[in-house]
């Protein structure tokens, strides 16, 4: 997992043989997860990557760009100008397990506070409701969904809430997973 603020840790206990094989990682060694994709370092590279993805998919699939909640106005603007179809803004309440507790609990902007600047960016570009806006990070209840939609999101994304609903409310390490 990644945080919107830097590197995420993937601890050796999380890297089972199956995960090591899927991700081509050595088992038994703590790993760092980069906060950005190595194929781009700026907005021009993002546009190139989006075009590359469009070619690979024959222009038949929507391109989603997920941004952390650090600079929602500017990152939404960049993603729209680069050609994204859908922008997912992930606020600080997202349920990552791959970083230190101090980051999980104290760093980033609250999810709903990220929404208004992202909507404003879309409105300023004349793209609100043209480019879809999805908000994620700590959306747990119907009231959270209603607030997000009322503030201008087209959809919400849930993660931890769905896991809890499925009975996974006691996260623990499973040696045989």
Residue ranges and their predicted role:
Residues 1-7, 11:
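Single conserved hydrophobic/aromatic residue that forms the stacking wall/gate
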Residues 16-19:
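ATP-dependent carboxylate/acyl-activation modules
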Residues 34-177:
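Glycine-rich phosphate/ribose-binding loops and adjacent secondary-structure elements
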């Amino acid at each position: 997992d990644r945080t919107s603020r830097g590197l995420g840790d993937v601890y050796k206990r999380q890297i089972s043989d199956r995960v090591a094989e899927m991700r081509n990682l050595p088992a038994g060694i703590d790993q760092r997860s980069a906060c950005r994709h190595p194929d781009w370092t700026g907005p021009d590279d993002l546009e190139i990557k989006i075009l590359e993805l469009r070619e690979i998919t024959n222009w038949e699939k929507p391109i989603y760009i997920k941004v952390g909640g650090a600079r929602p106005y500017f990152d939404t603007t960049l993603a729209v100008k680069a050609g994204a179809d859908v922008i997912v803004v992930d606020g600080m309440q997202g349920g990552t397990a791959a970083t230190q507790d101090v980051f999980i609990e104290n760093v980033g902007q609250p999810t709903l506070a990220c929404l208004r600047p992202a909507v404003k960016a879309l409105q300023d570009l004349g793209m609100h409701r043209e480019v879809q806006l999805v908000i994620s990070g700590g959306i747990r209840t119907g009231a959270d969904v209603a607030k997000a939609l009322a503030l201008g999101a087209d959809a919400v994304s849930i993660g931890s809430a769905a896991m809890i609903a499925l009975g996974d409310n006691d996260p623990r390490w499973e040696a045989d997973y």
